[in-house]
Amino acid sequence: GGCHAQMYTMGTLLRHGSDEQKAKWLPKIASGELRLQAFGVTEPTSGTDTTSLKTFAKKDANGDYVVNGQKIWTSRAEYSDLMILLARTTPKDQVTKKTEGLSVFLVDMREARGHGLEIRPIRTMMNHATTEVFFTDMKVPKENLIGEEGKGFRYILSGMNAERILIASECVGDAKWFIAKASAYAKDRAVFGRPIGQNQGIQFPIAKAYANMRAAELMVKEATRKYEAGMDCGAEANMAKMLAADASFEAANACIQTHGGFGFAEEYDVERKFRETRLYQVAPISTNLILSHLAEHVLGMPRSY
């Protein structure tokens, strides 16, 4: 998780930060001296309806910003030195389009902890460090505004596309693990005097999971190609995430079914990975929202939400 987080959060700064910001922060992030792991976007009342977020950054007399609000499902905040934060800087009722009036900040969490920043861990069913984050009159220097004030939604989208591509890559890796684990067990486990992998009822789910994993992997590569070339890759990033998440969970189901009762035993690791890969049916974007995006923005259908 830490590796992919560093890549997609850093992309927002890399693509939209000023020369001064890049010179100050990027070398230390690249060397590992500073950890940029936290991406503060989701809120308890907004979820994927990002433009309805309530965290507000107000300018003070010196032109610096004072932030109040709350984020949730902010992964790795406990282990991060810096945070990419999306906050509203113009009230929603004062903008023409709801995507306007949102700004992105780089928060130095080392300075902010105990000075308006509070982090509360959330326990989950899997090995994933995630938190609630509270901002109470937290100050952010004006030089930590990334890009132009009010244009942050556009900046954050590029980070979200990178996140979806990276999560998709992880899901492909998970699917490969499940398929390899299931195949090895099916060849080794003998029942009624022969390997269970000799039965088509065992073979077919694993083989189908493999085919779907390979198809998802190709979409991940296409999304990556377009992202690296600076092309519009929203549809491809979303499709890669959806297909890879589905392939991973399909492979997880096949793997746990192949192992039978042993699939639920901790020593085989299957149940742990099964719980972990279930997350990606929901995060960082749900399958239904991806389908709505494709229907509207690719197929030209009316907006459904």
Q: Where does each model-flagged region fall?
A:
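A short, Trp-centered hydrophobic/proline-enriched beta-strand micro-motif
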Residues: 32-41, 86
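Flexible, small-/acidic-enriched active-site or ligand-binding loops
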Residues: 111-139
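Beta-sandwich/jelly-roll carbohydrate-recognition scaffolds of carbohydrate-active enzymes
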Residues: 52-56, 72
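Short beta-strand-to-turn element immediately C-terminal to the catalytic PLP-Schiff-base lysine
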Residues: 15-17, 58, 85-89, 106-108, ...
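Alpha-helical interface subdomain recognition
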Residues: 1-3, 8, 16-21, 32, ...
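Long, acidic (Asp/Glu-rich), low-complexity accessory segments flanking structured domains
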Residues: 137-154
